[in-house]
Every structure is written in structure tokens, then in C-alpha cells.
């Protein structure tokens, strides 16, 4: 259904499409099917698949996208962090940040014309592709003539990061609850565990210094500060210990996400 609705929307001339599918329900395979149908029909000949982590690109290339092997390439560094786009391929795999030049260097995506790609699929588009100030947005705006498909499990509607504004309302939604009811996903249980510094906050002793020898600002650090403004080494050990203990209690080889 997701494939049909996406292809139908594109056939109607819709240039931005959003597909929402819960984690573990087959977003990547759905992306493959969409690309396969549009590429085979000749509707889309040059395709760019964007992700934010190498493991997602590498895994996708050897698994779901394996049938594209003969005409698929990954945009990688050719030396000193410089990326090169070989125009002879048809399906391109890339990390968002690899297409945006490092400070003082030109953006690699400028090597090709704005109409080079016919189709761009943005994996995990909630991670920032729709932010006005995002580097990823530069890529999407440059290739604005291409049909752009955003795929996510968690659409955002935050100010400045609203992928509903950018891609439009989803043409298809497959929720976590639906996945559980259909038997594709296992039911889950939320276990809440709290550490004293998360609940009560933490205030350094007067004159206390950090690991770099700098004096820590004297104030109450609350939950939202921990992990951002400061890191408490002992807290990490406590978290690791509790997670390890939980895995031993429930069976350390139990399948989880």
C-alpha cells in the first residue's frame, strides 16, 4: 500500500511525499520497491538515497538494495575529505554531511547540475532535513526539481523542524500499534529507572574542578543539563551497570531494538 500510494502521488505530480512507518516495519524495503518501480518504468533515472550514518548506507547496499548493485554507487571521499560524484551511475547512496563541503571548501553536490537527480529519498527525515538552518536542507533546495520522498518513523512538528510543512501530510502511515496488532512487531514494556542526580539535580562543591582542571560553575545542574552542559562520569557507570544487570535478568540474548 505504501509503495502504491507513493507512486500514485508522484504520478499525479506531487513533488514532496512523506511516508511514515514504525521502526522495524520495512521502510528500507519499501524505499527499494518505490525506486525499483519508478526506475524500471523510466520515470526516474537518477536517484539519490540519503541517510545520516554509514552503517545505514552500507547495510542497505548489501541487503535491500543489492539488486541495484550494477548501477549503484556510494559517494565517498577521494582524499583529504573530498567527495567525488561519478555521473555514470544511476542510484547514488550518500551521507547528508558528505554532500556539504567542509569549511573553506566547495559543496560536493555542486559538481552536478541542479536537475541531475530525478528522485531523492531522505531516510529518517525527522533527523533534520526539514530544518531551515540544516546543512541537509541545502542539498534538498539545490535539487529542488527532483521528487523528494521523506521516510520516518517519527514525524516532527517542531518549530523550525516541521517535516509535515516540508513534505506535506503523509501519503501513508503505518503506526507502531498497527505493527504490533498485525504481528510484525513485538509488544513492548516501558521500564522507568531513575538515578538520584536526575531526580534531585547536582550542585558542585565550592571550588570543585572538572577533569580538565577547570572550576565548575557553582549552580544547580538539573536533568536537562546533564549530558549537555556537563557529564558525570559516575552516572555513566551507574547507567551501564543497571542496563547490564537488566540484560542478565531478562536474558542477555533477548532480541531488542
What is the predicted function of each stretch?
Residues 92-95, 147-152:
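Structural recognition of the conserved hydrophobic beta-strand(s) that form the central parallel beta-sheet
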Residues 161-254:
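Interdomain helical connector at the RecA1-RecA2 junction of SF1/SF2 helicase-like NTPases
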Residues 1-46, 55-71, 87-91, 97, ...:
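ATP-dependent helicase/translocase motor core
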Residues 43-45, 71, 116-117, 144-147, ...:
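Short glycine-/polar-rich loops that comprise or flank the Walker A/P-loop
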Residues 110-150:
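SF2 helicase catalytic motif II
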Residues 56, 98, 126-127, 156-157:
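Residues immediately C-terminal
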Amino acid at each position: 500500500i505504501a509503495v502504491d500510494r507513493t507512486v500514485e502521488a508522484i504520478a499525479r505530480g506531487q513533488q514532496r511525499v512523506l511516508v511514515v512507518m514504525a521502526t522495524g516495519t520495512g521502510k528500507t524495503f519499501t524505499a527499494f520497491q518505490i525506486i525499483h518501480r519508478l526506475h524500471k518504468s523510466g520515470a526516474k533515472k537518477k536517484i539519490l538515497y540519503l541517510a545520516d550514518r554509514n552503517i545505514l548506507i552500507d547495510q542497505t547496499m548489501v541487503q535491500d538494495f543489492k539488486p541495484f548493485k550494477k548501477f549503484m554507487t556510494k559517494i565517498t571521499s577521494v582524499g583529504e575529505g573530498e567527495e567525488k560524484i561519478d555521473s555514470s551511475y544511476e542510484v547514488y547512496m550518500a551521507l547528508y554531511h558528505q554532500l556539504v563541503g567542509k569549511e573553506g571548501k566547495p559543496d560536493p553536490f555542486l559538481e552536478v547540475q541542479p536537475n541531475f537527480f530525478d528522485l531523492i529519498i531522505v531516510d529518517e527525515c525527522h533527523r533534520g532535513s526539514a530544518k531551515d538552518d540544516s546543512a541537509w536542507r541545502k542539498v534538498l533546495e539545490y535539487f529542488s526539481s527532483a521528487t523528494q520522498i521523506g521516510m520516518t518513523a517519527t514525524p516532527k512538528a517542531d518549530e523550525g523542524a516541521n517535516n509535515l510543512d516540508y513534505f506535506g501530510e503523509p501519503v501513508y502511515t503505518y503506526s507502531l500499534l498497527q505493527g504490533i496488532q498485525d504481528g510484525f512487531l513485538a509488544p513492548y514494556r516501558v521500564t522507568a529507572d531513575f538515578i538520584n542526580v536526575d531526580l534531585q539535580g547536582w550542585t558542585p562543591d565550592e571550588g570543585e574542578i572538572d577533569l580538565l582542571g577547570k572550576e565548575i560553575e557553582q549552580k544547580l545542574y538539573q536533568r536537562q543539563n546533564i549530558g549537555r552542559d556537563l557529564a558525570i562520569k559516575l552516572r555513566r557507570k551507574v547507567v551501564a551497570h543497571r542496563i547490564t544487570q537488566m540484560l542478565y535478568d531478562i536474558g542477555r540474548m533477548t532480541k531488542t531494538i
